[in-house]
Each structure stands twice: as structure tokens, then as C-alpha cells.
Amino acid sequence: MIELLFPGWLAGIMLACAAGPLGSFVVWRRMSYFGDTLAHASLLGVAFGLLLDVNPFYAVIAVTLLLAGGLVWLEKRPQLAIDTLLGIMAHSALSLGLVVVSLMSNIRVDLMAYLFGDLLAVTPEDLISIAIGVVIVVAILFWQWRNLLSMTISPDLAFVDGVKLQRVKLLLMLVTALTIGVAMKFVGALIITSLLIIPAATARRFARTPEQMAGVAVLVGMVAVTGGLTFSAVYDTPAGPSVVLCAALLFILSMMKKQAS
């Protein structure tokens, strides 16, 4: 049993290390809908990967990165409100991906695995890919932490201090896209954003500094992964949703504790 769970557990722990600090910025900057858009569009990457006979893992990363860059470009053109634009792109990309996959009669596709993930199907090659992605994400966040914080707290002051706002914003969106692309196969397109939001929202109730919040979010994510996989193994439930459910339970407990104190 341990041999079966360990690769998935290790993958989840690594993803939690990236999702903690990144999710903090998603919560601070209210980017959850942006994350949902990229997550839904990731299924389109799967469809293109299968259609072009390319590894869907890399196709998902490519599509999410391209979409993130496109959203930054469209954000500068205020013909439509950004939430309207995100809603249109999210559901259009998800629908197109589902239609393309359904038209591939010669290819057997497990849509449930892509929609809800399968942490228990992690291979050694997957672990290497996740590790590389997590190292890149954490390194960029560490490198740009001060600029990202300045932009989040006060864009005007950040601009005065010489922060290149558009470049930093693009970098944050690309890092978010990379994280979603890496994690999509293991957590699923429909629930991946929750692993960014819930641990960070839970940590926010206990942290006094941004750095504390990022660190606590990582710990919450690790506990959720461990608890969710254990629950999945004992009761034979889907691994990804079990992890998210465990994270949601931790959030509810944090709210109850905060109210009691």
C-alpha cells in the first residue's frame, strides 16, 4: 500500500510547495477566476496533444502559458470587463477541448482522469517533470517576491519604486499557468484551482506576515495531501477530490477556531 501511495504523496507534497506561496498571491490579488480559466483551458491542451500526437503533459503547459500571455494582452484592451472575458474563455476552451476529444473515435481517452486527476497514477518520469516545474515556480517567486508584494500592496508605489508592473504581472500569470499545467494531470482540470486557493485562505487566518502566510499555506497543503490520500486509500475514493475535501475541512476548522478565539 505504501509503495502505491508514495509517488502520489510525493507529487502532492512537491505541488504544495509551489501552490502555497503562489496561492497566497492568487488570494491577495483575487485571481481565482483567472486560475479557473487556465484550469478549464488545460483540457484543450490535452485535446491538442492527443490530436497532434504530442505528450499531453507538455501540450497542457504550452496551452496554459499561451493563454496566460493572451489574457495579459487582452487585459490592456478594455472592450470587455475582465471577468466577462475570463468567463467566455474558460467555458469556450473547456467546451472546445471536450468536443475535440469526443471526435477522436480512434483514441481512447479517460476524461474523468483529466477532469478530476489521478494522483495514484504518478510515474517516476512524472515526478521528475513535477520537480522541475516546482523548482522553476519557487525560484521565480523567490526572485520576484519583493516586486510581487509591492505590486500587490500598491501598484502606484511599486511603479514609483521602479517596478516594471506589466512584466511582473505577466511573470505571475505565466507562473500560475505553469503550476496549473504541471498539476492538471494529477489533480484535475475542475478542482486544481482549489489547491491554490484553499490552503492560502486557511493560512491567512493564522499568519501575520506575507512570508508566514506562504509558509503556513505550504504546511496546510501538505496536511491536505497526506490526509486526502490516506482517506482515499482507506475508503477507495478518488484521490484528487479527497485531497481538496481535506483542504476544505481544514479551512472550515480554521474558521471555527478563529471565531472561538
Swiss-Prot record:
Main location: membrane
The keyword Magnesium appears for this protein: no
Record topology, Periplasmic segments: 1-7, 75-83, 143-177, 235
Matches recorded under Pfam families: ABC-3
Bilayer-crossing regions: 8-28, 54-74, 84-104, 122-142, 178-198, 214-234, 236-256
GO biological processes: response to zinc ion; zinc ion import across plasma membrane
Gene3D superfamilies with a match to the protein in the record: ABC transporter involved in vitamin B12 uptake, BtuC
Record-linked CDD domains: TM_ABC_iron-siderophores_like
Subcellular location: Cell inner membrane
Family: Belongs to the ABC-3 integral membrane protein family.
UniProt function note: Involved in the high-affinity zinc uptake transport system.
Record-given protein name: High-affinity zinc uptake system membrane protein ZnuB
Organism: Escherichia coli (strain K12)
Gene: znuB
